[in-house]
């Protein structure tokens, strides 16, 4: 493992350095962190200016967490003083990227990018960006960590998430992917990105930036600029090559992959979770892994054993109840997919559905469409949560038991009315806080078992 000492940093940053720390004898750093919550002992803390303060305000917390030293554009006895901390961090990220000789895969899309990143990382034994960390500062820290810890040939898979125009170009300038994956184009983050054409334009930049391989999921293909079709590989369940057949009941994926010589490779596996979205992500991971030199059998074994990110269609068996936790995010396309997964689970089925945020002017109609979708579903009951979901509640008619709560606190007070057998989906935008409901139900079950 390499370390970053002050001399090395000065050599890399050049005239961006203003002064060395006043405190002498500081140890070399094992990496960088721009947020104290992500700081590991031995890393240097990069104190950035923010909308509500400066990172140096948290210097004591960083030191208590074990920071080797600080990098800041404001004076501190243990800080390497630079002209602009954000610019210095970006420079270090670009330097780290230049040291890599292995593939760097950028993964983006309106839905499915985190799961695809996770499975692709497993299939290729790659380092992956943690969680859904997508800011330039955080990704610069990921690049530096990979440079210091990994062999330069090890694959690196980075999630590229954006919610406004111009962000993708900034991320791509830093990450410079050799391979690009576009999972889906759908209505998400419309407030900052614009309409669906704007989403497609921004997301597809990852393909333009990737010289060695371009992979496009079935849900993105129709929205893609036709000029990119010839240079991109379309991947989806159904016909074509590559493609796959998915048995939802058995969680079995039977994949047909395209070999580099144009031939076919076949492999079957049991997926580590539920639903067609997971099967689609696995298919992409298997194809990219094959192109990166991993045998289909080994890639399939790794995908089958992958540990998925929490709160993405995560199933919990609570006695007679299967709780489907999809409380991390929500958009029209992911709501439909989650309801499809719920439909394959044991009856009686019910759902708790929160607001789909950041849809801009589409919010009213999108929630009305969700209500119509729920009305047609085979559900014993549905609980809507949040002000925007009121429209979905009003559009839900028929035989369902239906409820609306203005916020998660109100539902938590009434959670005794939720079903305790069959299957229950809980899904909504993260800001609604439905993860609190999931945790409350899990804790309730744990107490029941303990007693």
Regions from the PLM with identified roles:
Residues 1-91, 95, 343-347, 351, ...:
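N-terminal leader/targeting and accessory segments in enzymes
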Residues 9, 43, 62, 92, ...:
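Residue-level signal for inorganic ion chemistry
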Residues 9, 13, 72-76, 181-322, ...:
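Acidic, Mg2+-coordinating active-site environments of NTP-dependent enzymes
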Residues 51-53, 60, 309, 328-401, ...:
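Active-site beta-alpha connecting loops in nucleotide-dependent enzymes
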Residues 80-84, 401-411:
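Short acidic-hydrophobic, aromatic-tinged amphipathic segments that line or gate anion-handling sites
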Residues 88-218, 223-228, 440-450:
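Phosphate-binding loop of NTP-binding sites
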Residues 107, 310-313, 431, 435-437:
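ATP-dependent carboxylate/acyl-activation modules
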Residues 173, 410-419:
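Short amphipathic alpha-helix with an adjacent loop that forms part of the alpha/beta core around
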